[in-house]
């Protein structure tokens, strides 16, 4: 897989991990308007969703750039599993193994994410990372790109690292994220803006596994 593909796909997968982190890892709070309670209600909304499907646009911009790059994609999630579709790649993750297919190269890379990668794909590790490594702050209310009222929550790391801050915009009444922005120390700002989200999309577990029968001529590169 070419390096630029890896970077773009990895950014998407990282956002998926962050999404799963905040929706799976956090406990349900009371109904006061503070950061942890807002995140708690978002967790409850996801746990009760019975699977979700979402369309999104991802924007990436480097410091000093007047214009960045963007692309659209879709994602389906159930528990810690997801299937991600972007213009350049398809990714399946069944909670343990990840398959990334790049059509231009006609190849599939198979990995079992470990270490730093698991911090983005394993909800339990993400939960521990959030609880131990970030401080959540309620920043007020705003209007989401879809016109709905939303809460703004900002996460800042307790220790210096690659991430400077994570900004979450969570719809006030549905409790689902409308926008997630991650700012890195290298000046890159990446935003996923969710345009459509449906609940009750309870796909079977096999939906989150790469099926070689659907891609008979593809080259499978097992990196496990």
Task: Annotate each PLM feature.
Residues 1-11:
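N-terminal secretory signal peptides that target proteins for export/translocation
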Residues 14-27:
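Bacterial N-terminal signal peptides
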Residues 25-67, 78-81, 219-224:
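N-terminal leader/targeting segments and the immediate start of mature chains
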Residues 58-60, 86, 102-103, 181-184:
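Beta-turn initiation residues at beta-strand->coil junctions
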Residues 72-120, 190-191:
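An acidic-aromatic
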Residues 113-149:
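Flexible, surface-exposed loop/linker segments and immediately adjacent secondary-structure boundaries
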Residues 135-223:
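Gly/Pro-enriched, hydrophobic low-complexity segments
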């Amino acid at each position: 897989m070419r390096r630029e593909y890896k970077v773009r796909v990895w950014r998407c997968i990282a956002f998926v991990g962050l999404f799963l982190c905040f929706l799976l890892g956090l406990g349900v709070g009371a109904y006061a308007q503070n950061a942890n309670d807002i995140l708690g209600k978002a967790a409850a909304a996801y746990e009760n969703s019975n699977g979700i499907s979402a369309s999104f646009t991802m924007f990436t911009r480097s410091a000093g750039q007047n214009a960045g790059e963007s692309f659209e994609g879709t994602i389906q999630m159930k528990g810690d599993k997801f299937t991600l579709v972007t213009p350049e790649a398809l990714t399946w993750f069944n909670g343990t193994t990840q398959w990334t297919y790049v059509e231009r190269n006609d190849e599939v890379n198979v990995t079992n994410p470990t270490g730093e990668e698991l911090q983005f794909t394993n909800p339990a590790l993400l939960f521990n990372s959030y609880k131990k490594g970030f401080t959540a702050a309620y920043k007020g209310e705003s209007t989401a790109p879809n016109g709905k009222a939303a809460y703004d929550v900002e996460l800042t790391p307790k220790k210096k690292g690659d991430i400077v801050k994570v900004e979450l915009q969570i719809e006030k009444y549905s409790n689902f994220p409308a926008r997630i922005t991650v700012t890195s120390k290298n000046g890159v700002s990446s935003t996923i803006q969710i345009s459509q989200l449906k609940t009750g999309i309870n796909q079977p577990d096999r939906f989150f596994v790469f099926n070689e029968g659907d891609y008979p001529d593809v080259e499978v590169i097992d990196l496990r």
